Amino acid sequence: MLQNMTEGAPLKLIIPFMVPLLIGNVFQQLYNIADIIIVGRTIGVNALAAVGAVSPLFMLTMVLTIGLSNGFTVVTGQRYGAQDMQGMRRSIATCVVLSVFFVFLIMGIMHLVIDPLLVMMNIPPELMEDAYAYVMIIVDGLLAMMAYNLLSGIMRSLGDSKTPLYFLIISSIVNIILALVFIISFGWGVPGSAFALVIAQAFSAVLCVIYIYKRFPQLHIHRSDFQLDWPELWAHLRMGLPMAVQFSVLGLGIIILQSVCNKFGSDQIAGFTTAMRVEQLALQPMISFGIAMAVFTAQNFGARRFDRICDAVHRCSLLTLAFSLFAAVVVFAFGEEVIGIFLDNPSPTVMESAHLYILYTVPVYFFLSQIFIYRNACQGMGVSMIPMLSGVVELIMRSIAAIYLSVPFGYEGICMAEPIAWISCAIFVFAAYHYFVRLLEKKYTLVD
């Protein structure tokens, strides 16, 4: 059901809304972590390093599909809210056409640039074969990833946020089972992990199609719904492209960081990859609060309730501070034990590399938590350039820090890059939020 967030205590609205998002995000991370654990423990350090070395490319393709599909389905949700069923079916048809177009466009570009791209990323020769196989299987299976993201986005736009979560859980279980079968029973190695991921995503997409077909007969699209024109296409592109660009800028920053890391060898790559997976899991509560913040802010901005926006941002800022401190304590206390899960008898260099990354990043989780709150608050108020510019700030600071600090400090310089990027971005979005919330409140007060 759709939820009205313009009345009632902000946290009592935001927290229940955030919990399903958190569960879904955690399973999304477990979806990826399961592959890393299975690869690391059953094949070895080099296999884990190969997957880790190209994981930013996988992440880039993933965020592209998420950005596009989330943006496209905004139009679907708007028409559903207006009870424009014919327009909604046209929107779904447009989403399908644009999604297929962009999938094949991305696939074509990746096939053209993958060889020089892997060289530019400094993939060690001993990892190249597995790294190439893994990323190309993911790229060739991009249609499955886009299909799931689009269909789950359509369901969320209709107010159904639980069913995509159920399908994601089922998909995660299928992924783990297939990875074990392909790697251990069939002996397919790293490609087996990629095949398991693609098949699991395709399976979840099929479940979405079946559910939508049976649950929402009003969504059955017909040939006439595919009679598209430029205004219809542009209505979706102007939503999807900015979100895809915003996510892609962050993905490019991670690619540059990984490229610098790849110069230091398999053990450092494995340690860096493992530490980042642990970090992503620890950050999920803060990420989920950010998503909920965007929804809350958007509704209250529409109602011109700037007092509620400021109150919610303040309360969520303090709450995510508590979460960031808790996450820091947990990662500091149990980080090495968790890292040990990923590999069977990891070398001291792997453990040291992972621990060093944690040592530098955990103390600044607070700054990262504030980025999620303030950036999403700006997004909810319709100031879409701030999230995009904040991504550019992160990209520039992360890239400069990684490239220049890695020369005198080696691998340790890479670990310094993330805190520098986060602190810079946090200062930017904090200042931008306070500027625009005052500006917009003054503007609409004068209008009213």
Task: Locate each region found by the language model.
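Short alpha-helical transmembrane segments in multi-pass integral membrane proteins
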Residues: M1-M18, T76-L143, I183-L241, T297-V364, ...
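Small-residue-rich hydrophobic transmembrane alpha-helices
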Residues: L48-G108, M145-P164, G271-G335, L368-S390
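Hydrophobic transmembrane alpha-helices of multi-pass small-molecule transporters
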Residues: L60, N175-A179, A205-V209, L281-Q284, ...
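Residue-level signal for short hydrophobic patches within transmembrane helices
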Residues: E7, L11-L30, A34, L57-L64, ...
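Transmembrane helical elements of multi-pass membrane transporters/channels
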Residues: P16-D35, I137, Y148, S171, ...
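Short runs within selected transmembrane alpha-helices of multi-pass transporters and secretion channels
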Residues: S69, I137-R156, P164-S172, S193-C208, ...
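Helix-terminus/linker motif at the lipid-water interface of multi-pass membrane proteins
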Residues: V26, L30-A49, L118-P125, V181-W188, ...
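Small-residue hotspots at the loop-to-helix junctions and early N-terminal turns
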Residues: V45-P56, A131, V135, A194, ...
